[in-house]
Regions:
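Walker A/P-loop
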Residues: 17
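A glycine- and Lys/Arg-enriched "phosphate-lid" helix/loop adjacent to the NTP-binding pocket
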Residues: 99-166
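Post-transcriptional modification and biogenesis factors for structured RNAs
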Residues: 171
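ATP-binding Walker
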Residues: 13-14
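Phosphate-binding P-loop
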Residues: 1-3
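ATP-dependent small-molecule kinase phosphotransfer cores
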Residues: 26, 30-123
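Hydrophobic anchor at the beta1->P-loop junction of P-loop NTPases
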Residues: 6-8
Length: 173
């Protein structure tokens, strides 16, 4: 049996990471084999890219950010997601392709056609289910600020986060 690929999407502080625990508990009760993962940042390459992408010390252009995200995603799919799905294991990912449309397309105002082209060229897998966590930006950012330190994305101005939320909502319709 092929596993299921479920992605969790939403702005910073929307509750994705917290909800992973609830999903894991439900799958445990149903005796379903699963792994929890995240983007960016699964595996050694992913962890390195995550550090580069989230560090406030790095000034990265939107184009470079997009290419690094897509490189991480392709590696994540090939090395972790697809092998587990083929072994019947469910994969629950904190972020996936919708985050690129939201953050780079909406937040960074990049051409969505470029994201479409990269996605198609890389033959990216479509999730079986995507769950969007939506709440007002002000509330989500307030929740994110309660963490130990803010990353490069969390420090962006509120209009950046409003554009991200708008794209998420549009993609969910």
């Amino acid at each position: 049996m092929k596993g299921k690929f479920i992605t969790l999407e939403g702005i910073e502080g929307s509750g994705k990471s917290t909800s992973l625990e609830d999903i894991a508990n439900t799958l445990d009760k149903k005796s379903i084999d699963y792994i929890l993962t995240k983007e960016p940042g699964s595996g050694s390459l992913g962890n390195e890219l995550r550090s580069l992408l989230l560090s406030s010390d790095n000034k990265i252009s939107g184009e470079v950010e997009l290419l690094l995200m897509m490189a991480d995603r392709k590696n994540h799919l090939d090395s972790l997601v697809i092998p587990n799905l083929n072994n019947g294991i469910w994969v629950i990912s904190d972020r996936y392709l919708d985050s690129t449309y939201a953050y780079q397309g909406g937040g960074r105002k990049m051409d969505v056609a470029l994201i479409d082209e990269l996605s198609s060229s890389l033959n990216l897998l479509a999730p079986d289910l995507t769950i969007l966590f939506d709440l007002p930006v002000e509330i989500a950012l307030d929740r994110a600020k309660r963490r130990a330190s803010l990353d490069r994305f969390e420090k962006e101005p509120i209009d950046f986060h409003n554009r991200i939320r708008d794209i998420y909502k549009a993609r969910a319709e």
